[in-house]
Amino acid sequence: GEPGEQGLQPAREGKTDAAYWNRDYEPGAIERDRLVQQRLAKLGVAVRTFKDHVVFEASEVRGATGEPLQRYSAYRARWWTKWHATTPAVQPIPTALAKKKVAPLPLSRPLPSSSELGYDPVVLWIQPGEEHARKRLRWFVEGPLHSYVQGRNLPAIDGSSKLSAHFRFGTLSPRIAIHAA
């Protein structure tokens, strides 16, 4: 169906007064979120978005006059300066938010397995979920991180973090990773 349509149903039924989500920075997602936010506003539902997938948003790391930085080295230097000046803390989920009523998700069938679709079984190269993400981060920080420059280019060894999927799908925060390193 249309992106965001399922999330609008509780609002249409008058079962919610606010919607919360983490910002996504891909062009298609930005447009989707803008449209959903407009629809929710028409229904009288407040929207609150949060920075989650990045440590600093593009608007937070700028040149001295506020312009976007053109060279990576300048961006990197400004990023680290900002990091050391602010060192954003990892925030726990507010207890007031944790106690809020959450609209139920619509019932759906589980996705079919690769075998059910006629393909060979798939072996996952990462384990999904927050617990596995944190274990992998701990393993990486305690070992391969210290020889990353060499290890990342050697396919025969497990020398990279393999955390990108966890960052992308929100099972690991970049702020947690930077604090761990």
Put a short name on every predicted segment:
Residues G1-T87:
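Trp/Phe/Arg-rich N-terminal binding region typifying the photolyase-homology
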